[in-house]
Amino acid sequence: MLRRGFLSRINAAQWSRQMSVVAKSLKYTQHGEPQEVLQLVEDKLPDPKDNQVLVKILAAPINPADINTIQGKYPVKPKFPAVGGNECVAEVICVGDKVKGFEAGQHVIPLASGLGTWTTHAVYKEDQLLIVSKKVGLAEAATSTVNPTTAYRMLKDFVQLCPGDTVIQNGANSAVGQAVHQLCRAWGINSVGIVRDRPEIAELKQMLQCLGATEVLTEAEIRTSDIFKSGKLKKPRLAFNCVGGKSATEVSRHLDNGGVLVTYGGMSREPVTVATGPLIFKDIAFRGFWMTRWSKENYSSPERSKMFKEIFELMEQGKFVAPNHEMVPLAKFKDAAAAALSFKGFTGKKYILDMSI
């Protein structure tokens, strides 16, 4: 096994010296709308040295935070010229002479944010990467470091949940929402999802229930529902908000005494309004969560390793799938960016750049 890994590094290094790698990257030199500022640029990459790893990107999703970063609306401000994207799954091509934990052919994902993943090839440091089993699907691996981890941490870090407890969330069809449903199913937790009404509401409800949602209600239905008062489900002790405005207020209204509302997004761009009654008489707490901060503070922590291990085990077992998505060729990145900017792109479908097309 050791000899095979050693030969793999030697052969890969020889291949690297014989063939120059030209990366096609989506770069931008100023903030603005992605369709306007992103350019497909070719660059020759250097051979990996020391602790560096050369990878071929296989698939990279377009997340709301990626769009906001390009627009200049996100707290993370990359240096120009910058390559878009934070997530991906890649294949190791070759490694530097001091790399010990990686070899050619392995699948990896980025552990650090802001590396720039909308590119066909890249050179990263070995401590910026995590090996992923090839049993994990490309779409699952490519979308594993933002939405599943956000759902995991919010379910673990704010309220000590037990099987049979209930969680309620708006934006239940978002990528994080879909991840919440699946984790709740795996852990025996009831998951109540709230979505906007739409012509295809029956199909949407069925899709979310297949993922693990216990109940899916529209914003109008939740206002008159008796699922909690009747005792059908326990009152939620934990709520997730990615919409804001009236939707967040309605979600908080259903929390049990001492419940916690966690806000991780604001798609409506309306502020979270705290109702006085629940705040005083039910001692409701309002918290915020940002996965990027948690990852930086826990970069090498055992808890982070445990989280990825659990998520990937569920993926390998077929108990956790990628969000509803569409694979898009890199050449059509402008169409994908425009679609991702739409409300549907934020809540209905994930667009993933397919670097193999």
Swiss-Prot record:
Residues 1-19 form a transit peptide. GO terms for cellular component: membrane; mitochondrion. The active site is at Y74. Coiled coil: none annotated. GO terms for biological process: ceramide biosynthetic process; fatty acid biosynthetic process; fatty acid metabolic process; intracellular iron ion homeostasis. Its main location: mitochondrion. SMART domains: PKS_ER. One of its GO terms (molecular function) is enoyl-[acyl-carrier-protein] reductase (NADPH) activity. NADP(+) binds at residues 147, 173-176, 196-198, 264-267, 289-291, 349-350. Keywords: Fatty acid biosynthesis, Fatty acid metabolism, Lipid biosynthesis, Lipid metabolism, Mitochondrion, NADP, Oxidoreductase, Transit peptide. InterPro entries: ADH-like_C, ADH-like_N, GroES-like_sf, Mito_Enoyl-ACP_Reductase, NAD(P)-bd_dom_sf, PKS_ER. Its EC number is 1.3.1.104. It comes from the Eukaryota. It is found in: Mitochondrion. Disruption phenotype: Larval lethal. Larvae have increased iron levels, which accumulates in brain neuropils. Larvae show increased levels of ceramides and some phospholipids due to dysregulated iron homeostasis. Larval muscles have decreased mitochondrial membrane potential. RNAi-mediated knockdown in neurons produces age-related climbing defects indicative of neurodegeneration. Neurodegeneration phenotypes can be alleviated with drugs that reduce ceramide levels or by reducing dietary iron intake. Gene3D superfamilies: Medium-chain alcohol dehydrogenases, catalytic domain (3.90.180.10), NAD(P)-binding Rossmann-like Domain (3.40.50.720). Belongs to the zinc-containing alcohol dehydrogenase family. Quinone oxidoreductase subfamily. Catalyzes the NADPH-dependent reduction of trans-2-enoyl thioesters in mitochondrial fatty acid synthesis (fatty acid synthesis type II). Fatty acid chain elongation in mitochondria uses acyl carrier protein (ACP) as an acyl group carrier, but the enzyme accepts both ACP and CoA thioesters as substrates in vitro. Involved in iron homeostasis; affecting Fe-S cluster assembly and ceramide metabolism. Required for proper morphology and bioenergetic functions of mitochondria. Required for maintenance of neurons, including photoreceptor neurons. This is Enoyl-[acyl-carrier-protein] reductase, mitochondrial. The lineage of its organism: Eukaryota, Metazoa, Ecdysozoa, Arthropoda, Hexapoda. The gene is Mecr.
